[in-house]
Amino acid sequence: MSSSIEEVKATIKSVKLTDSQAEKLSKLIDSLPKILSGLDNPEYDEIFGYRINTKDKPYVDESIRNEILLKFLAADDYNLELSEKRLIDSLNWRNEFQPLSAAFEETFDKELNELGVITNFPNSNLKITTWNLYGNLKNPKKIFEKFGANNKVSKLPGSQFLRWRVGLMEKSLQLIDFTSTTDNRIAQVHDYNNVSMFKIDPGMKKATKEIITIFGANYPELLSTKFFINVPLIMGWVFTFFKTIRVITEATLKKFQVLNHGNLSESFNPDELPKVYGGKVEKSLFDIDVSDDIKLSEYGEVILKKVGDEEINHINDDVE
């Protein structure tokens, strides 16, 4: 049964849709059976922990599903053909990469624990933020190697750094409200304190490009602002690099704020922000990190169990 324009409009709370936009979203929703049937794995229908399927299926939250689909539409300026392709490619990527596993099952090099933090500031305009602390990257070559120690993880694509970074993003998305007008995106802070341009590992440059490409393709319309702080003037090449690799849209570039200091008190509530970033809080970022407390959505748990069961069956088949 097709979704009417008014029915679709009623499910979207984050923005006010025009009739034309609602019609495009309605068509994308109606295309879901066709899209899913053409996937590498038609059973994989999860994005950001939510089920992207017809509303008669269990675990489908129609409002959140539609808000997520709307982000895919908006990312391609409501071009239905491009949005369908983006959705197909993203579902296929998620099936192969297993980002929920990266976020909630895998363990990484201890050094990565010092490299990223997620904060939840309920009284700030920017509530959910991921922090990337590049100055703490002590052993880049090790980080950028492929997994090898864990048999399960070694079969999944990506370096430790890439899988960890995707996992951090996935965790942060469990905290946003897709139906909110103000809290349906996250902020990112990239802190370059103590980073020398002479210490930038070639693997880090490669990983940066890979992350930008993956995030641009699979995490549409989820970024409110990206801060680059404590950036030495001599590191201007970093941002020239972003432009020259041409994997970032102009709209995304406009969300970048580059600062040669670390004072973020104008963007975050000082009462929630650590002193090192211009706030009033005595604690460090790591003291207020919420990443270990984040719970995966119900359907995300279902998907992880399903993938795990399939893996066990494959192992049993191989043994037999």
Swiss-Prot record:
Residues 120-285 form the CRAL-TRIO domain. Heme binds at Y134, R165, H190, Y192, K226. Its cofactor is heme b. Pfam families: CRAL_TRIO (PF00650). The keyword Transport applies. The keyword Amino-acid biosynthesis does not apply. GO terms for molecular function: heme binding; metal ion binding; phosphatidylinositol transfer activity. GO terms for biological process: Golgi to plasma membrane protein transport; phosphatidylinositol metabolic process; regulation of establishment of cell polarity; regulation of exocytosis. Signal peptide: none annotated. Belongs to the SFH5 family. Non-classical phosphatidylinositol (PtdIns) transfer protein (PITP), which exhibits PtdIns-binding/transfer activity in the absence of detectable PtdCho-binding/transfer activity. Regulates PtdIns(4,5)P2 homeostasis at the plasma membrane. Heme-binding protein that may play a role in organic oxidant-induced stress responses. This is Phosphatidylinositol transfer protein SFH5. The gene is SFH5.
